[in-house]
């Protein structure tokens, strides 16, 4: 059906709704790209339909929910010669891109360890997530967390550090171990929203994942959407000659010789890596390696 945006006929748009409305949208021959921003479980079926109909696809994270779906998207993209892009916005944050450029130019030496996270207290948002119907009291996201264990939203933290470590550009993830706390807040949320006792809430309030790569690098990823604390994606790179950190304090740590080797002249005589470099040096480094 057509709806007016209030500014005349020129702003009329065709609206496709319902569980399968996207199928009709994907059949149109005047659309080049389908942008998918639904609940997680609908990302894959909408993307699959779009690719099968010859459309380029841009998918909010996560792009798929299991390995089978991941490979199917790869195969469909290659078969139909259409782009299929995961929209991991955190890879394109200014600090991350600036720091990636530094890492690729050897400012930190060899990056051997990296940290990333999605730590975001969703207390103000749980009640606003889409619900399937009147009987759905939890909303899609809380329901998914209740049914699944582990880091269910890893790419905000993982994407930027994977780039810095050249994952699939000379290295690969090889070994993974994850550990979580018990669920306390999750169970309380079910009781609060569904008015029933929750005996099983699979997602721990805080999950920590350690990954070792084939080249001996280590990645630590954290996930916590339950407990009260400041928003934090960590983003930390540990190199053999330098250090970068975004949350909670943005800064770089290099000694004087490494800063000189990176093309920036220190303004202080005793610059070392025991603390973040002074603002003047940091500004000069950042400007030199603008992405």
Predicted regions and their residues:
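Single conserved hydrophobic/aromatic residue that forms the stacking wall/gate
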Residues: 1-11
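Beta-strand-loop-alpha-helix segment that lines the small-molecule cofactor/substrate pocket
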Residues: 10, 33, 39-40, 44-92, ...
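A structured beta-alpha segment of the ubiquitous adenosine-cofactor-binding alpha/beta core
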Residues: 13-31
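Non-transmembrane alpha-helical segments in soluble domains
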Residues: 23-26, 47-51, 74, 100, ...
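Predominantly a Rossmann-like dinucleotide-binding segment in NAD(P)-dependent oxidoreductases
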Residues: 83-85, 90-201
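C-terminal glycine/acidic-rich active-site capping loop/insertion
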Residues: 185-204, 212-213, 241-291
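Glycine-rich phosphate/pyrophosphate-binding beta-alpha loops
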Residues: 221-232
């Amino acid at each position: 059906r057509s709806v007016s945006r209030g500014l005349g006929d020129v702003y009329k748009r065709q609206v496709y709704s319902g569980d399968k409305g996207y199928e009709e949208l994907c059949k149109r021959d005047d659309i080049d790209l389908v942008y998918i921003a639904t609940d997680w479980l609908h990302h894959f079926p909408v993307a699959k339909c779009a690719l099968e109909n010859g459309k380029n696809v841009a998918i909010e994270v996560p792009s798929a929910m299991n390995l089978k779906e991941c490979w199917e998207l790869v195969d469909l993209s290659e078969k139909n010669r259409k782009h299929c892009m995961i929209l991991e916005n955190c890879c394109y944050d200014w600090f991350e891109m600036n720091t990636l450029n530094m890492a690729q130019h050897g400012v930190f030496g060899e990056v051997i360890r990296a940290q990333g996270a999605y730590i975001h207290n969703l207390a103000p948002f749980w009640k606003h997530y889409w619900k399937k119907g009147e009987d759905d009291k939890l909303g899609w996201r809380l329901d998914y967390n209740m049914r699944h264990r582990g880091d269910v939203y890893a790419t905000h933290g993982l994407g930027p550090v994977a780039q810095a470590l050249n994952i699939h550009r000379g290295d690969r993830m090889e070994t993974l171990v994850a550990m979580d706390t018990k669920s306390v807040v999750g169970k309380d949320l079910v009781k609060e929203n569904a008015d029933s006792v929750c005996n099983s809430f699979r997602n721990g309030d805080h999950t920590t994942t350690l990954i070792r790569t084939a080249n001996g690098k280590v990645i630590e990823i954290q996930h916590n959407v339950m407990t009260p604390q400041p928003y934090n994606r960590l983003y930390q790179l540990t190199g053999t000659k330098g250090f970068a950190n975004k949350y909670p304090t943005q800064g770089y740590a290099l000694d004087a010789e490494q800063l000189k080797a990176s093309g920036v002249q220190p303004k202080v005589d005793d610059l070392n890596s025991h603390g973040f470099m002074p603002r003047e040096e940091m500004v000069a480094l950042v400007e030199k390696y603008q992405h």
